[in-house]
């Protein structure tokens, strides 16, 4: 529905920002991971969004990267996890640590998020284990993963963005891995 919102930051709260978009103030709920990388009030920002429509109104949830939005949507697909629970997880667990925890079956790493108990964490692991990337896969030398990761970090991407972009990529060289990852990040 609304792919993203770009505008001037008018207000910053504990779990939201208000973005002025053509004279309309849009309240966007964001995880702490997004909040800490936003520019200050008065600056322009772009957030990828998820629109939740309910009987009593609607809410917009925003994320600095498409990867965060994608993980948020995957979390919402888990029975018993709503937008606030998904935001809670994304606020305290990075994407790469989340993927590692789910693939390792480490429910304790997820229970650090407020409102996420043992049963919910176990359900998240059960339902998302096959929907998340396992790890970076290369056909040749395994040092490619580290070199490709370092290249993406040098280009200004965060570690979690770079790991997500390199996940499940099969290639023969560092150059191919970086090219494929950049294509994934540009989508």
UniProtKB/Swiss-Prot annotation:
GO BP terms, alphabetized: DNA recombination; DNA repair
Recorded GO MF terms: ATP binding; four-way junction DNA binding; four-way junction helicase activity
GO CC annotation terms, alphabetical: cytoplasm; Holliday junction helicase complex; Holliday junction resolvase complex
InterPro entries the record matches: DNA_helicase_Holl-junc_RuvA_I (IPR013849), Hlx-hairpin-Hlx_DNA-bd_motif (IPR003583), NA-bd_OB-fold (IPR012340), RuvA (IPR000085), RuvA_2-like (IPR010994), RuvA_C (IPR011114), RuvA_C_sf (IPR036267)
Location of the region described as Flexible linker in the Swiss-Prot/TrEMBL record: 136-139
Region (Domain I): 1-64
UniProt keyword DNA repair present: yes
Subcellular location field: Cytoplasm
Positions of the UniProt region annotated as Domain II: 65-136
Region (Domain III): 140-187
Keywords: Cytoplasm, DNA damage, DNA recombination, DNA repair, DNA-binding
Family affiliation: Belongs to the RuvA family.
Function statement: The RuvA-RuvB-RuvC complex processes Holliday junction (HJ) DNA during genetic recombination and DNA repair, while the RuvA-RuvB complex plays an important role in the rescue of blocked DNA replication forks via replication fork reversal (RFR). RuvA specifically binds to HJ cruciform DNA, conferring on it an open structure. The RuvB hexamer acts as an ATP-dependent pump, pulling dsDNA into and through the RuvAB complex. HJ branch migration allows RuvC to scan DNA until it finds its consensus sequence, where it cleaves and resolves the cruciform DNA.
Subunit details: Homotetramer. Forms an RuvA(8)-RuvB(12)-Holliday junction (HJ) complex. HJ DNA is sandwiched between 2 RuvA tetramers; dsDNA enters through RuvA and exits via RuvB. An RuvB hexamer assembles on each DNA strand where it exits the tetramer. Each RuvB hexamer is contacted by two RuvA subunits (via domain III) on 2 adjacent RuvB subunits; this complex drives branch migration. In the full resolvosome a probable DNA-RuvA(4)-RuvB(12)-RuvC(2) complex forms which resolves the HJ.
Alphabetized HAMAP family for the sequence: DNA_HJ_migration_RuvA (MF_00031)
Record remark on domains: Has three domains with a flexible linker between the domains II and III and assumes an 'L' shape. Domain III is highly mobile and contacts RuvB.
Protein name stated in the entry: Holliday junction branch migration complex subunit RuvA
């Amino acid at each position: 529905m609304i792919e993203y919102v770009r505008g001037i930051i008018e207000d910053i709260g504990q779990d939201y920002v208000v973005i002025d978009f053509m004279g309309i103030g849009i309240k966007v709920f964001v995880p702490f991971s997004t909040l800490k990388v936003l520019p200050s009030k008065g600056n322009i920002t772009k957030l990828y969004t998820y629109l939740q429509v309910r009987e009593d109104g609607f809410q917009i949830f925003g994320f600095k990267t498409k990867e965060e939005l994608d993980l948020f949507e995957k979390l919402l697909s888990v029975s018993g996890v709503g937008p606030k629970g998904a935001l809670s997880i994304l606020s305290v667990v990075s994407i790469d640590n989340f993927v590692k925890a789910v693939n390792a079956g480490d429910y304790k790493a997820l229970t650090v998020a407020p409102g996420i108990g043992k049963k919910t964490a176990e359900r998240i692991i059960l339902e998302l284990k096959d929907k998340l990337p396992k790890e970076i896969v290369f056909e040749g030398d395994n040092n490619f993963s580290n070199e490709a990761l370092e290249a993406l970090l040098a280009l200004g991407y965060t570690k979690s963005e770079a790991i997500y972009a390199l996940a499940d990529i099969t290639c023969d060289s560092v150059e191919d891995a970086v090219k494929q990852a950049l294509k994934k990040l540009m989508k």
